[in-house]
Amino acid sequence: MPYPDLYDEPTRSRRRPWWVKMFLVVVVLAILAAGGVAGVIWYVAQDLPPLNSVTAYQPSLVSRVYSDDRQIVGQFFVERRILTPLSDIPQSLIHAVIAVEDARFFEHPGLDVIGIARAGWMNLRRGGKVEGASTITQQLARALLLSPERTYIRKLKELFLAYKIETVLSKEQILETYLNQIYFGQGAYGVSAAAQTYFGKDVAKVTVPEAALLAGLPKSPNNYSPYKHPERAKKRQEHVLTRMSDAGFLTPRERDEAAAQLLSFRHGMPAQTAPYFMEYIRQQLMAKYGETAVYKGGLEIFTTLNVRMQTAAEQALRNGLRQLDKRQGWRGPLRTEDIAKVVASAPPPSDTPVKKGDTMEGVVTKVGKDHVMVQAGSIQGKLLFDDMAWAKRRLRGRDLARDVIVAPTVKGLLKPGDVIELAVKSVDRDAVSFELDQTPVVEGALVALDPRTGAIRAMVGGYDFSRSEFNRTVLARRQPGSAFKPIIYATAFNAGLSPATVVLDTPVVYEQEDPDKTWKPENYGKKFHGMTTLRSALTHSHNLATVRLLDKVGVKSVVDFSKTVGITSPLNHDLSLALGSSSMTLLELASAYGVFANQGFRLEPYAVGVVQDQAGQILGQNLFAPRQVISTETAYLITNVLEDVVQRGTGQQAKSLARPIAGKTGTTNDYTDAWFIGYTPNLVVGVWVGFDDIRSLGETESGAHAALPIWVDFMREALLQLPEVPFEIPENIVFVTVDAATGLLAADHGDQSTVEIFLKGTEPTQSAPPRTDSTRFYQIDQGIDGIGELPAAVQP
């Protein structure tokens, strides 16, 4: 039998122990796992976005618009964000955010292992996800660099990016970027916009309880909104205060005191200031700088808008249009509803009390002999007949410019179930009295300019921007009627005529190209005034005298002069120009009057003075350069005559302002347009009133009746900001006593004489004949159609 090999071991002794096998398995698995992790890391690392969005942080910023006294009056934005340095953010807000979002922010390298473990334990104990573990740096990486998808790969990318961010930015830089980036709800991005949105204050003035409220919002802005869910918002604020106390930022006493304070929230954003003006400059900015710069570039836009004047302009126009609309009569109830249903569905009394002037809809519930009862929401009130008597019906007469007025009765106006517009007249304890109201359908516009600079101080392009965004100050071309006449008379003065030059205001017929047609202009009221001076003709707005003057001065001369003073709209090249038949915008006509107010110097109207980028670099600036386009003497001559329009003519209502004022009314055929353009040495203001669809405003609704009251109401407030200064008299203007009827030297200084102004060298040298000399009328009639020989410079 063979001997066993001494070197052979038993089979059992050659088997590896189990722990060796286990060790080998673990090693292999570890290698595989490490390889897998390395592969995942490699894969994730290959697809990481660059850090440019973080290291060169350029968020979408609000472009802010400022008034002439540096008040913020508007904003343009995609995301309402105001970039704020960390040094300008109060410590209480910084502490609140850190405490609730990432208490170990200054201790970890971008991902917080301890925080992850704590959050996992808390979630395990409470049986669900009640606490997150994302650090501030992770949230920043997610917001700036990653898509919103919820996948494990995205989470890994978030961790890697957070670590990388911590290697290139300081903790302070990360925190500043985060506080400017995060969304707080209500359209507010970043802490500054959030402070303005919720509390209406600068972020630097935020208190501890307010800071805690804000810090609790980013987790879920909708769920913790103090407007939608006040109880949840309060609990969230208390949670933040507790975390601040746990982190050592507050003592327990400070925490309790902060939690006990009542917060006052800003309810709704304020109504946009000067919406027509804002849209006007927005279009200009978009054309010059582009959409990205305007809506995301954080531009600082300094405008010419005067807030007090703008407010006065809006109120004056709205009040004037409402009064005019009521003069036109009532258009009837809005609709009819079932009274029982209205009363049954009336809401509970509101915590907000009504006040005088508030407007609302109401339903007529009962009709009496001299009053009606109305239900307006939760309010029951009375409407007396005297407070609805304006609601007369207007019946169109045969003459398109005339209406027949029919007086109303209560039962003739209203019946139960009628839905009507109401305005609160008075509130006496629990009793509310109403007056019948009506939203105007008539439109209007007002623009105010500083003639010395061209700066637009106020602009209202219509009754209500939300109803119509069409800006009637710059887009609506309408016939100015007699408001154009000063340009014709200024052309004559510029050519050497004087306010004392006489002209015949008598019937005249002009042949047209068609031999079967003639044109016969008429005066307002169909009256004639015979021989009259240019001063009197313009003061009293005589059409026939103006047509004769235009005929002799020359249409081309007036058209050229119009362009010189700023009229850019095309003008009719015929004698109808004398009656203001050529359409133009309110802004261009007001700007033309500004040349008269500014002693012959023209400046282009402008609304934006300076535009800066977010770093303060000037991108654009209005460097206004005045150009003298007519002589100082011509400007004063026309101004002096237009002062007479206010003192003795169609603009007499403006006398109540007791300031040096010049101006002119304008009314077109059938009262379709009403104008008043007036000025002082430091402000020129134009008002237009009319329907968009060009129809009559009604009989008597002339410029003096429809537009001038609005102008006066505005100027009463606007002039409070401006010093009283006289119109400066040029050296070459001389004063001469003349005969009021003929414009010649007065034979005596009795009642028939007046002091007139002349450009030196144009004053009369011939004395007026005795009034009994009837041959004088024959002599005048033998002149050039009632004006006499014109200077050579203006011979047609």
For every predicted segment, state its role.
Residues 125-150, 204, 271-273, 452, ...:
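Conserved catalytic neighborhood of penicillin-recognizing serine enzymes
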Residues 97-98, 244, 313, 369, ...:
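Active-site SXXK
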Residues 1-66, 104, 124:
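N-terminal type II signal-anchor transmembrane helix
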Residues 128-379, 549, 556, 560-564, ...:
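Non-catalytic, structured segments within soluble enzyme domains
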